[in-house]
Curated annotation (Swiss-Prot):
UniProt name for this protein: Tyrosine--tRNA ligase
Quaternary context: Homodimer.
One Pfam family hit: S4
PROSITE patterns: AA_TRNA_LIGASE_I (PS00178), S4 (PS50889)
Catalytic activity, reaction form: tRNA(Tyr) + L-tyrosine + ATP = L-tyrosyl-tRNA(Tyr) + AMP + diphosphate + H(+)
Family membership noted in the UniProt record: Belongs to the class-I aminoacyl-tRNA synthetase family. TyrS type 2 subfamily.
Origin species: Burkholderia mallei (strain ATCC 23344)
NCBIfam families membership: tyrS
Motif ('HIGH' region) on chain: 59-68
Segments forming domain S4 RNA-binding: 351-411
Motif ('KMSKS' region): 243-247
GO MF terms held by the record: ATP binding; RNA binding; tyrosine-tRNA ligase activity
Compartments, record wording: Cytoplasm
Length: 413
């Protein structure tokens, strides 16, 4: 036994603790420091005091997509183990703008944008988290009262040299790309959140590792027990290349219609499907490994893609919605028209095909409409449109763009 009076008592690593550690580690990129976290779990089990687990999200956009749920799923697993989950809305840090992974300064949001986005943030996150067991906090609670004096004192706790250890800052500095002083404040303020919340564990994407470590360092300086950090992989988007992002158009929003969600998930590659199983499915790793073995043995990978799509749709909607989405998908695959397509009434016949598609809400612009026509992706009542100069006469007809976009159009003069 250690004679060091500052050493902490060791708590027994029981089977319960080993199970909790295994649940925690599933699908993670990194857990720092694992031995410390095992002791935190052991202490929690021995004392009955739950750990305080923090996830901060800046409301930079109003919608949450499946990429966000990778870390939310992990929060739910930890919540189900009995720990306290803190869903931290970064309404103050959003005013600064997170520079993580950026090669240029990210423009900060306005207060109005932040408040608007934050309204829907937790409602969507609650589709994953247990609402009754989640503590919701806003970091403006402790960041706003700091004032200039407190901000300067906080800034004195970290050096510019340490900030430049961060890869994205280093690249910008070496490349002569400007770095604003306020960007150095972001990791400091995120780290200070951990001090204010006395966090035991903080979660984030792999691009957040530096910021999470700042929190650990600040806790030490403030005399707190240091948080452990857990980073989750960034989910690739539908293209399988870049990370899922609304701005890149390769995302699946968790509030999308069941049919749209199902169709998007069925569009991913067979290779990407296994990545989605690992990061998004709640099935056991043994079951996923068995599925993969069956696919390699000759079973159609589509069977497993359907299972994945149904599981995810059911989670955010219902099992009945998932079944209907499958029926709808199979119907469309056979060339059928879905039952629930929107009805649109337009005027101005004869109307240019590009304008018709745009006004019907099937494309964002006429240039996008013309591109789809060039690719043979536009149909009127099942007939492919090839003439980009087509003028559509008055009447009622079904218009289709791509595989999933339909509208029942009534066009008048």
């Amino acid at each position: 036994m250690s004679t060091d009076p500052t050493s902490k008592p060791a708590f027994p690593i029981t089977d319960e603790v080993r199970h909790a550690l295994a649940v925690t580690k599933r699908g993670v990129d990194e857990l720092l420091i694992e031995e410390e976290f095992a002791q935190k779990l052991a202490k929690s089990a021995a004392t009955g005091k739950p750990l305080r687990i923090k996830l901060g999200l800046d409301p930079t956009a109003p919608d949450i997509h499946l990429g966000h749920t990778v870390v939310l799923n992990k929060m739910r697993q930890l919540q189900d183990l009995g720990h306290t989950v803190i869903f931290l809305i970064g309404d103050f840090t959003s005013l600064i703008g997170d520079p993580s992974g950026r090669n240029a300064t990210r423009p900060p949001l306005t207060r109005e944008q932040i408040e608007s986005n934050a309204k829907t943030y937790f409602e969507q996150a609650a589709l994953v988290l247990d609402r009754e067991k989640t503590e919701i906090r806003y970091n403006s609670e402790w960041s706003m009262p700091l004032g200039a004096d407190g901000m300067i004192k906080l800034a004195s706790r970290y050096t510019v040299a340490r900030m430049l250890e961060r890869e994205d800052f280093t690249k910008r500095f070496q490349g002569g790309i400007p770095i604003s002083i306020h960007e150095f404040l972001y990791p400091l303020m995120q780290g200070y959140d951990s001090v204010a919340l006395n966090a035991d564990l903080e979660l984030g994407g792999t691009d957040q590792k530096f910021n999470l470590l700042v929190g650990r360092e600040l806790q030490k300086q403030y005399g707190q027990e240091q948080q452990c950090i857990l980073t989750m992989p960034l989910l690739e988007g539908l293209d399988g290349v870049e990370k899922m992002s609304k701005s890149k158009g390769n995302y699946v929003g968790i509030s999308e219609k069941p049919t749209d969600m199902f169709g998007k998930l069925m569009s991913i590659s067979d290779v990407l499907m296994w990545r989605y199983f690992e990061l998004l499915s709640f099935r056991s790793l043994d079951e996923i490994a068995r599925f993969r073995g069956e696919a390699e043995g000759g079973r159609n990978p589509r069977d497993f893609k359907v299972m994945l799509a149904q599981e995810i749709v059911a989670r955010f909607h219902s099992q009945a919605d998932a079944e209907r989405a499958l029926e709808d998908f199979n119907h469309r695959a056979k060339g059928g028209v879905p039952d629930d397509i929107p009805a649109v009434t337009l005027a101005g016949a004869p109307l240019a095909i590009g304008q018709l598609l745009k006004q019907a809400g099937l494309v964002p612009s006429t240039s996008e409409a013309l591109r789809n026509i060039e690719q043979g992706g536009v149909k009127i009542d099942g007939a492919t449109v090839s003439d980009k100069a087509l003028k559509v006469d008055a009447g009622e007809f079904v218009v289709q763009v791509g595989k999933r976009r339909f509208a029942r159009v009534t066009l008048t003069a």
